[in-house]
């Protein structure tokens, strides 16, 4: 009899929990999603898997291929919607160190030594120095392989490290003091910039694709902005057929243009191309792509996406991770 009463109470508890869950707002249980990506010209979308990093920030792992199915591309896209509680931070090895303060880092900025470190370790150093929650990290600008100096703009916490290395004339991605983002030509006044990192050239400028004609298939990396202020980062793995053959620059341009990006710059690709994320419900930043060297490479600068959300201790939503979350067209 006691066993029967216990079983009845257990079932009553389970039913009560289920009924409570049905009363929770649907959006509290739903993962962020973005629209299915538009493939680059001449490519088809094979699959797309979306992961929420925080509300308004979505990681999309995609596979593209030719219609013949003989040139697969593995891509990693992060979409940061306007109003998302996150911001970008430029990073360079040795700037963010444990125990440093904004004041000490400002003093250090004028004499920062050129050196290299992995993207994920730069993110870890940022967290040690500031306590910030890095939810996405990617490598940044080209650099001089002898001196390790980045070629273009580098601004961190409003501290101008350099506008260029005396030779390059690179455009730059910027976080402005009002919290908005911009991609600007070299030479444009940067007094209103908090964070900046350069890329060697434009992929899209003022809504116009910048095709190069370069036929090389390579790992590619980039960042762009849509007309509504949405920021898109995209990395394509390469040199690893049949897993991922890579992209030409023009294919990368075509892909970004199809997503509605109006301004975009190229970032360092090849073996340096790195994309790491911390998915909602997890505690560690993990490299999601497969660097073509087989391991994560040390790089000069990096770009970190940091959550600015503050916990108030109140339940907001549950993070659900079903086993099958893949979008496959026409399935």
Positions of predicted regions on the chain:
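A substrate-binding/cap region within the structured catalytic cores of diverse enzymes
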Residues: 166-210
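Bacterial N-terminal signal peptides
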Residues: 13-23
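Structural recognition of the beta-strand scaffold that forms the well-ordered cores
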Residues: 135-139, 172-174, 181-182, 222-224, ...
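Zymogen propeptides
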Residues: 31-165, 182, 325
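Sec-dependent signal peptide cleavage junction
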Residues: 21-35
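Conserved beta-alpha junction segments in alpha/beta enzyme cores
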Residues: 63-67, 72-77, 198-228
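Bacterial N-terminal signal peptides that target proteins for export
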Residues: 2-14
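Conserved, well-ordered active-site substructure
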Residues: 147-167, 209-262, 272-324
């Amino acid at each position: 009899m006691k066993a029967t009463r216990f079983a009845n109470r257990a079932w009553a508890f389970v039913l009560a929990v289920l009924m409570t869950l049905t009363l929770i707002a649907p959006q509290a249980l739903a993962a962020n999603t973005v629209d299915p990506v538009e493939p680059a010209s001449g490519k088809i979308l094979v699959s797309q898997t979306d992961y929420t990093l925080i509300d308004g920030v979505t990681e999309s792992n995609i596979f593209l291929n030719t219609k013949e199915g003989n040139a697969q591309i593995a891509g990693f896209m992060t979409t940061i919607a306007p109003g998302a509680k996150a911001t970008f931070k430029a990073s360079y090895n040795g700037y963010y160190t444990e125990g440093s303060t904004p004041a000490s880092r400002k003093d250090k900025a004028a004499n920062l030594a050129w050196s290299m470190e992995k993207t994920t370790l730069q993110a870890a150093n940022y967290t040690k120095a500031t306590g910030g929650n890095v939810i996405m990290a990617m490598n940044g600008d080209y650099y001089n392989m002898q001196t390790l100096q980045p070629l273009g703009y580098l601004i961190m916490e409003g501290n101008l490290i350099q506008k260029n290395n005396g030779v390059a004339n690179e455009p730059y991605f910027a976080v402005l003091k009002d919290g908005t983002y911009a991609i600007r030509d070299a030479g444009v006044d940067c007094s209103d910039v908090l964070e900046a990192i350069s890329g060697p050239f434009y992929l899209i400028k003022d809504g116009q694709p910048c095709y190069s004609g370069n036929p090389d298939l390579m790992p590619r990396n980039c960042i762009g902005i849509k007309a509504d202020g949405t920021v898109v980062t995209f990395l394509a793995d390469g040199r690893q057929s049949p897993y991922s053959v890579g992209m030409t620059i023009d294919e990368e341009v075509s892909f970004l243009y199809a997503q509605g990006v109006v301004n975009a710059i190229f970032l360092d690709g090849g073996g340096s191309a790195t994309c790491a994320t911390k998915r909602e419900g997890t505690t560690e930043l993990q490299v999601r792509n497969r660097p073509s060297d087989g391991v994560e490479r040390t790089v000069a600068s990096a770009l970190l996406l940091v959550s600015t959300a503050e916990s108030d201790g109140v339940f907001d939503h549950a993070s659900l991770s079903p086993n099958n979350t893949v979008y496959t067209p026409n399935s």
